């Protein structure tokens, strides 16, 4: 199965992605991470108004296979979390880049994304091509 990695996103080594629109970063996990985790049964993300710091844990995701930490790709303040995905985590697998986003953050320093991976760089890293 070939997994998708949209070109308009930035990717992290830890498998989170960022869609940047102005100073708002939409954060989720990549199709590779969803595929590796298997059936997702629980997601915990921060509440609106909470601060997150780049590289620090901002939540957890639990599947039938494992529990994984979510790492913040950027620093900022959570302005929205995806309660629909928290309430129905199994839906994440169907659309990780669309309806499956996790949090939206007002970023404090856009330069933090300087070292993020492009779609082709991320694909090469996870697929070894």
From Swiss-Prot:
Residue ranges of every copy of the Lipoyl-binding domain listed in the record: 24-106
Protein's UniProt keywords contain Coiled coil: no
Gene Ontology CC: one annotated term: cytosol
Biological process terms in GO annotation: glycine decarboxylation via glycine cleavage system
Textual note on the cofactor: Binds 1 lipoyl cofactor covalently.
Matches recorded under PROSITE patterns: BIOTINYL_LIPOYL, LIPOYL
Cofactor(s) essential for the protein: (R)-lipoate
Residue numbers carrying N6-lipoyllysine: 65
Keyword check for Repressor: no
Matching InterPro entries: 2-oxoA_DH_lipoyl-BS (IPR003016), Biotin_lipoyl (IPR000089), GCV_H (IPR002930), GCV_H/Fam206 (IPR033753), GCV_H_sub (IPR017453), Single_hybrid_motif (IPR011053)
Alphabetically ordered keywords of this record: Lipoyl
Domain of life: Bacteria
A matching Pfam family: GCV_H
SUPFAM superfamilies: Single hybrid motif
Function: The glycine cleavage system catalyzes the degradation of glycine. The H protein shuttles the methylamine group of glycine from the P protein to the T protein.
PANTHER family on file: GLYCINE CLEAVAGE SYSTEM H PROTEIN (PTHR11715), GLYCINE CLEAVAGE SYSTEM H PROTEIN-RELATED (PTHR11715:SF3)
Subunit and interaction comment: The glycine cleavage system is composed of four proteins: P, T, L and H.
Family statement drawn from the similarity comment of this UniProt entry: Belongs to the GcvH family.
Name of the molecule in the record: Glycine cleavage system H protein
